């Protein structure tokens, strides 16, 4: 295929092993968790599963980070060359004392089950695996996984600056589907200039999602 021709695909990826990994956990980064009101080293365990978008000639990477107990929060890093990234010191998106806490906070914590180092995954929870697109109005739409220790549920949030986010709740709100295991929502986009922008197809936004299986969902307003 002619590499100059129009295509839906992004060809010619090349690993740059000389600088990989481009992000590592920084064990000294801390912030005050709004639920426990305690100091947390929010990415001391892992950094993984990022999403990226270009704004003003800068690559902004939203990435999942885990603390010692496996609570996931979303951090933000930026780069002017797409290879070397600088992190913000605190997460931009995290479980909070809000209506989404029931889906983002491990049920064991609510039941008072004591922490144990013998179970490294018992307390996994939080906000995971961001996917981001720009809307036609210029705002940013992020799908993410809310995890309460039992069920992964796709959720959605929006932002005008990639730092301050508004949560809009579960994507699959219907009682029939809201407790189904769902994650990894990828909204269909179209290239507009140098941006990938969410686009309606025959009047509807479309989203692929799923991990072990692939499904589709539709929306009239991206929310």
Show the residue positions of the predicted features.
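Beta-rich carbohydrate-recognition and catalytic domains
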Residues: 1-125, 133-223
């Amino acid at each position: 295929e002619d590499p100059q021709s129009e295509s839906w695909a992004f060809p010619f990826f090349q690993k740059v092993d000389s600088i990989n990994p481009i992000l590592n956990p920084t064990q000294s980064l801390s912030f005050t968790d709004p639920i426990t009101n305690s100091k947390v080293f929010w990415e001391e365990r892992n950094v993984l599963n990022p999403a990226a978008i270009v704004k003003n000639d800068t690559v902004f990477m939203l990435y999942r980070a885990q603390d010692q107990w496996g609570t996931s929060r979303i951090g933000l890093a930026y780069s002017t060359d797409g290879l070397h990234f600088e992190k913000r010191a605190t997460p931009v998106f995290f479980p909070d004392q809000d209506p989404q806490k029931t889906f983002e906070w491990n049920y064991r914590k609510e039941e008072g089950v004591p922490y144990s180092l013998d179970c490294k995954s018992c307390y996994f929870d939080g906000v995971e695996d961001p996917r981001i697109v720009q809307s036609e109005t210029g705002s940013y739409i992020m799908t993410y996984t809310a995890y309460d220790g039992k069920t992964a549920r796709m959720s959605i949030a929006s932002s005008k600056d990639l730092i301050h986010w508004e949560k809009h709740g579960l994507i699959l709100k219907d009682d029939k589907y809201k407790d189904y295991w769902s994650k990894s929502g990828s909204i269909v986009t179209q290239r507009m200039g140098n941006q990938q922008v969410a686009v309606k197809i025959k009047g509807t936004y479309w989203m692929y999602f799923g991990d072990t299986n692939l499904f589709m969902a539709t929306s009239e307003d991206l929310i």
